[in-house]
Regions:
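Walker A/P-loop-proximal flanking segment of P-loop NTPase domains
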Residues: 2-65, 132-136, 228
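Winged-helix-like regulatory helical subdomains adjacent to P-loop NTPase cores
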Residues: 3, 219-222, 226-306
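Conserved catalytic segments around the Walker B and adjacent sensor/switch elements
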Residues: 63-83, 144
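Conserved NTP-binding/hydrolysis module of P-loop NTPases
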Residues: 72, 84-108
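Mid-core helix/loop region of P-loop NTP-binding domains shared across ATPases and GTPases
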Residues: 97, 101-147, 151-161, 166-168, ...
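A short beta-strand-to-loop transition that corresponds to the Sensor-1 phosphate-sensing loop
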Residues: 149, 182-193, 257-260
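Short regulatory helix/loop adjacent to the ATP-binding pocket of P-loop NTPases
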Residues: 177, 191-208
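Conserved AAA+ ATPase "SRH/arginine-finger" region at the nucleotide-binding site
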Residues: 208-219
Length: 306
């Protein structure tokens, strides 16, 4: 049972990544799998549909890794640009982000370093930066780079196969250059490995580990999610099970329905199907806040045959 002060701070989070101290965060099997894999240096990727909790998983995993002295950087690939940018600009932008996030600016003159590498391609510069700068100046026992919204590379005017080949090369170098044992990557996005690779002869993902991010199950969601329901309904576990039956455990919709119970339920034994019909299905376009169903519709409309 929650104390009054707990309830005062409790809220369901609909959309966006959950802060590390969110009481409504649901720990799933994927949390432990990803943490364990990254701790031992495995290359991981979390590919799933939108609003499945990838960003929240990344935030929580980063917090736990950093508590274990792992140096972490999260780069939102959408910030690096889309169709308008050149390959040179894109890779340089990635280096700038890594310099910024790892706070290297005070010990590293990026402009001078670049002037020394003008004869190298952008991907060669990134490779050199990783080995000669990142792995030297970041002294933590391990380094983990998260690349979020990685599916955005599909909108670029050039192939990023070289990026994934470089990630694979970092792993293959471990056998003869132990410094690379300190470095690992985690890719997150709405994609499949084959979506991201233009040249199908390249297979960078066969060295990686896929983390399966599935919907909430009652056993794992019961403790965090019933806490907000206890003051509003008589049987919070029963109500939560009804919510999960409707949402299939999809995180966004589950949080949204829990919040609707708190805000809209007319009795302590709410009819979840009625709430779904009234506040999600009927006039859905005007009630789709924050946008979720519209995003699904737009992606379906825009995804013609490849």
């Amino acid at each position: 049972m929650m104390t009054p002060i707990d309830y005062e701070n409790y809220e369901y989070k609909v959309g966006g990544s959950l802060p590390t101290d969110a009481l409504c965060y649901v720990t799933r099997q994927a949390d432990q799998e990803l943490l364990t894999a990254l701790e031992v240096g495995e290359f991981c990727y979390v590919f799933n549909s939108r609003q499945m909790g990838k960003s929240s998983l990344r935030v929580r995993t980063m917090q736990l890794l950093e508590a274990k002295k792992v140096a972490c950087a999260a780069v939102d690939v959408t910030k690096l640009g889309s169709k308008e940018v050149t390959a040179d600009q894109w890779y340089k932008g990635l280096v700038v982000e890594l310099v910024r996030v790892f706070k290297l600016a005070g010990t590293f003159d990026l402009k001078a370093w670049r002037n020394e590498q003008t004869e190298l391609s952008a991907i060669q510069q990134l490779s050199l930066f990783i080995e000669d700068v990142l792995l030297v100046k970041v002294t933590n026992p391990r380094i983990c780079i998260f690349l979020e919204e990685i599916d955005n590379v599909k909108s670029l005017s050039f192939s990023t196969d070289d990026l994934f080949a470089l990630i694979r090369a970092c792993y293959e170098q471990r056998s003869h250059n132990p410094i690379y044992n300190r470095l690992t990557f985690c890719l997150l996005g709405v994609a499949t490995p084959s979506d991201l690779i233009v040249n199908k002869q390249r297979t960078p993902f066969n060295i990686g580990r896929s983390i399966d991010l599935i919907g909430f199950k009652l056993a794992e969601a019961k403790s965090p999610l019933t806490q907000g329901l206890v003051v509003k309904v008589d049987n919070p576990v029963t109500v939560l099970q009804a919510i999960l039956d409707w949402t299939g455990g999809q995180p966004f919709l589950t949080q949204k329905l829990c919040k609707l119970v708190i805000e809209k339920a007319a009795s302590r034994d709410p009819n979840i199907g009625q709430l779904v019909q009234q506040y999600i299905v009927e006039h859905w376009e005007s009630q789709d806040t924050p946008p979720h169903l519209r995003t699904i519709r737009d992606r379906i409309r825009g995804s013609g045959p490849r």
